[in-house]
Amino acid sequence: MNIQTLLNKANKILGSSSSKSPKLDSEILLSEAINKNRQYLILNSNEELIKENIKSFDHLLKRRKRGEPIAYLVKKKEFWKQNFYINKNVLIPRPDTELLVEETLKLFNVNSKLNILDIGTGSGCILLSILKERRNFFGTGIDISKKAINVARFNAKIHQLSNRVKFYNSDVDNFLIGKYDLVISNPPYIKQKDLKCLELDVRNFEPKLALDGGRDGFSKITKVISKTSMLLKKNGRFILEMGFDQKSKILNILKKNNFFINKVLKDYGKNDRCIISTKI
């Protein structure tokens, strides 16, 4: 069977599934199965594939039809300017989370020397993206999941940043190491009752630990803010990602913990997404 025939077949199969982009998904999965890029598929559409490649593709296709996210199938996800290793133990990076990277780079110039803490680091993509852009920055990432920390360490190795970053398997409550110029965090902030309303791909496959914000969505956020107030240097900056409907309550929590609010950022969908504040 040739490449084009396989893609046509896959497009029909995924078209009847939860996939929102069956054609693109089919191309990505076939590229993965034969270890070629998508351009190769277009230029060699009549190429006959060997049985091993077809079998590998069919296996990936079945998993995608069941709703498993593309990032978990191909073990990678592009974030900021790099590809990061991703598996089922970490949340798949979202484009809106790039706001944390973008704002950090705006706040601190190339020559700044900075010590950064990333609370709930997951794959490490936020912290490592920042370090990749700034040679004088050093980072520490913590996560309650040991498996997530292993992913973050692997990504640091891939991007040759292991000499400028340390990762610790620790709950935010128990972490007491260091003082920081900047704290960044994308903590779990979804209410428990809303987890069942998430898209199928997210609900069934992404780690609940990285999504569940407790009964009211604030249990993890409150802990992160409290710990940040202890670990952040005076006049240090804090960049926090949040749910679209959480701004008012978080602003109050920040003020009670002696933070000055610099600004609230909206995501690409025009929803409130990040708060930048300063420890006073």
Regions found by a protein language model. Name each.
Residues 14, 108, 156, 228, ...:
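Conserved hydrophobic residues forming the short capping helix/wall of the S-adenosyl-L-methionine
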Residues 189-220:
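Mobile active-site "lid"/loop adjacent to the S-adenosyl-L-methionine
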Residues 215-278:
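Conserved Class I SAM-dependent methyltransferase catalytic core
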Residues 98-197, 223:
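Conserved SAM/SAH cofactor-binding pocket of Class I
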Residues 161, 206, 231-234:
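Helix-to-beta-strand junctions that scaffold the AdoMet/dcAdoMet cofactor pocket
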Residues 1-34, 41-42, 46:
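Non-catalytic accessory regions of SAM-dependent methyltransferases
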Residues 32-107:
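Conserved AdoMet
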